[in-house]
Design a protein with these regions (language model features):
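Positively charged n-region of N-terminal signal peptides that target proteins for export
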Residues: 1-4
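Bacterial N-terminal signal peptides
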Residues: 8-16
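Sec-dependent signal peptide cleavage junction
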Residues: 16-25
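Active-site-proximal alpha-helical
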Residues: 20, 276-360, 371
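Extracellular disulfide-bonded cysteine-rich modules/repeats
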Residues: 42-50
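Extracellular mucin-like PTS domains
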Residues: 66-78
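Non-catalytic architectural context of zinc metalloproteases
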Residues: 76-214, 218-219, 356-363, 370-374
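Zinc-dependent metallopeptidase catalytic helix centered on the HExxH motif
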Residues: 190-284
Length: 376
């Protein structure tokens, strides 16, 4: 009885199909031993079948390849920022995201500036500038799109031509009192200045293209066009607030000018460093001291200094201040801030009207973020 049970077990076991990977060669039609056994050989799966009284391998079918298990890429948790947590990575990223979102949603405007080119200007260099300028035009178009807008491009050697063109277009009001265009073209070698303003009521900027299109020079066109937006809404009042005027122009200038090649913000970091080192030592000392009152005085521009020193300081610290406001409160709020300047030139009252806090409060929150950007 025990022997009979054992034989039945062996018979049943032989009927169970087994799947395996064979190291020996499998030939269709050759003898196999276990009915319905499946064996993978090369790229096929062979099954042991019954043919008459014999067990043989069938022709096989293409083996199913195992689908690799993909590990889902974890979604990075956004850095939470607030007026009390101005994270050094989160703030630049959020501000940039807010600006680029607006840029991407802005259609290409069918609108071109009138261009006046000096005799020494190379067209290829102008084309480089226009690419960045068009981004600024599209970006500001929902708020600022003048009926006419003109750009004057010059190079070294175009001094006499520019003086004549200035008389024709009425550009002398753009210059500081007592200066000439020739003086500005000779301040730097090669010249790379730019100025925005109005020529007989037409929004205009003048730019010398003496330096290659790269680095900080990519922000010049969007920077100057931002000044025209400021003039349109802020009138003359915005010029009484240097960190706003130059700071917001420099911020939107580099964000639009460096896009889309600065995803890691390396250009931003290098640009900030160059702006810092362009400040005079007195301004740098105020920031290095990390003294809150000296910081507030510098933001309010109470420390005496020339127009150039105020501008140099405004580029650096104003760019950081603008970045913080755009990151925390968005782009539309910043436009509202600019519009409010036309009727409210007092910074403390202006911040209160737009953002709900006064000047001292903002500077106290901003200071650690600014100090953290002092190059080591």
């Amino acid at each position: 009885m025990k022997r009979l049970s054992f034989l039945l077990f062996i018979i049943l076991l032989s009927l169970i199909p087994v799947s395996a990977i064979s190291a020996q060669k499998i030939n269709p039609g050759s003898t196999c031993k276990v009915l319905k056994q499946k064996v993978d050989y090369l790229d096929k799966t062979y099954t042991c079948t019954k043919s008459g009284k014999k067990l043989t391998w069938n022709k096989g079918v293409a083996a199913k390849k195992a689908t690799p298990t993909t590990t889902p890429t974890p979604t990075p948790t956004p850095i939470q920022i607030s007026i009390d947590n101005l994270d050094l990575k989160g703030v630049p990223q959020k501000a940039n995201d807010n600006v680029i979102k607006v840029l991407k949603s802005s259609p290409r405007v069918n609108y071109e500036p009138t261009k006046f080119l000096g005799a020494n200007v190379v067209q290829a260099r102008v084309s480089q500038e226009i690419a960045g300028l068009e981004r600024a035009i599209d970006f500001w178009a929902p708020y600022f799109q003048p009926n006419k807008f003109q750009v004057v491009y010059v190079m070294g050697g175009d001094e006499e031509w520019l003086e004549t063109k200035s008389l024709e277009l009425g550009l002398s009001s753009m210059l500081p009192r007592g200066d000439t265009w020739s003086m500005w073209m000779k301040k730097q070698n090669p010249c790379a200045f730019a100025m925005a303003g109005s020529g007989k009521g037409v929004p205009t900027f003048v730019q010398c293209l003496g330096r290659p299109y790269g680095g900080g020079n990519r922000q010049t066109g969007p920077h100057e066009y931002t000044h025209l937006f400021q003039d349109y809404y802020g009138g003359t009042n915005h010029k009484r607030i240097p960190w706003y005027t130059e700071g917001s122009a420099i911020y939107f200038g580099w964000t639009l000018g460096f896009y889309p090649t600065d995803s890691n913000f390396n250009d931003r970091s290098n640009w900030f460093k160059s702006l810092y080192f362009n400040m005079n030592n007195e301004s740098k000392d105020d920031f290095i001291s990390k003294d809150m009152q000296r910081f507030k005085n510098r933001m309010k521009m109470l420390t005496p200094g020339s127009f150039d020193s105020v501008s140099m300081t405004s580029y650096w610290v104003g760019g950081l201040a603008t970045e913080v406001l755009v990151a925390l409160y968005g782009f539309d709020k910043f436009v509202e801030f600019t519009k409010n300047i036309q009727t409210n030139p007092d910074m403390s009252s202006l911040l209160k009207q737009t953002y709900g806090f006064d000047e001292d409060y903002f500077y106290e929150k901003l200071a650690p973020y600014v100090w953290a950007h002092i190059p080591l």
